[in-house]
């Protein structure tokens, strides 16, 4: 059997200074790149289009006309991948990598995430960010969120808000039946749903954070807290979301 393909999914919103650098780093590390421009008001979209036009490797852009939030950006990409999986264009063991466009995810550690899946047998790996340089309130908030999500997931998470992940496409496609995603809740919902569906999820691999970004609003944090039990209910009760 051929090696699993790696597909990078990169949401971007007003990331003009950093997005091309991130995409350049991904070339050679993944087999395909999907970029979602989440209604940027700067020149992020035009830069992405120019970059894609100059690539020989598979890369494509999904563009929103208005800002819809990170969860909607991921949903657009994941839905397309799920449909292509059903059509036989991808395999269930192919790997989806989520990478932020702001440069806070160190692409050089992708191999470590890959080894967690291929060698240790996980279905999904969420990188555990080293937040030691972040403000104390951010560290406390992350700990509270992770402990709360762990309770609903039935699995231990140290950094459930991490957007730096690698997941088997088959597991991700299965999880999509049971989560909705609102604004920024996609990461915590997917963690809860994957765990409750019986997939093996790792959140132990500690990775550096080259760029510190901390702009989470209280409203978004409260929404994420609320979505954990909602995700649990959908997964445990097997009540699919109307999509």
Feature names for model-found ranges:
Residues 34, 46-91:
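Conserved donor nucleotide-binding strand/loop of the catalytic core
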Residues 65-83, 93, 104-184, 211-219, ...:
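Acceptor/aglycone-binding surface of glycosyltransferases and processive sugar-polymer synthases
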Residues 1-3, 9-10, 178-243:
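Hydrophobic helical membrane-anchoring modules
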């Amino acid at each position: 059997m051929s090696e699993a393909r790696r597909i990078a999914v990169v949401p971007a919103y007003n990331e003009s200074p950093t997005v091309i650098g991130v995409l350049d780093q991904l070339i050679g590390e993944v087999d395909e790149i999907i970029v979602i421009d989440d209604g940027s008001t700067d020149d992020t979209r035009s830069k992405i289009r120019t970059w894609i036009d100059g690539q020989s490797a598979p890369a494509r852009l999904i563009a929103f006309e208005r800002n819809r939030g990170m969860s909607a950006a991921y949903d657009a990409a994941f839905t397309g991948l799920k449909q292509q999986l059903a059509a036989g264009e991808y395999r269930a063991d192919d790997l989806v990598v989520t990478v932020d466009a702001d440069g806070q995810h160190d692409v050089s550690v992708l191999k470590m995430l890959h080894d967690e899946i291929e060698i240790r047998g996980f279905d999904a790996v969420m990188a555990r960010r080293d937040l030691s340089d972040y403000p104390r309130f951010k560290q406390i908030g992350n700990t509270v969120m992770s402990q709360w999500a762990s309770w609903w997931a039935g699995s231990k998470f140290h950094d459930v808000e991490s957007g730096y992940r690698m997941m088997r496409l088959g597991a991700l496609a299965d999880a999509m039946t049971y989560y909705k995603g609102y604004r920024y809740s996609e990461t915590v919902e997917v963690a809860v749903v994957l765990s409750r569906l019986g997939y093996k999820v790792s959140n132990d691999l500690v990775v550096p954070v080259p760029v510190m970004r901390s702009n989470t609003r209280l409203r978004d944090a409260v929404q994420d807290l609320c979505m954990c039990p909602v995700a649990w209910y959908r997964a445990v009760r097997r009540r699919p979301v109307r999509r």
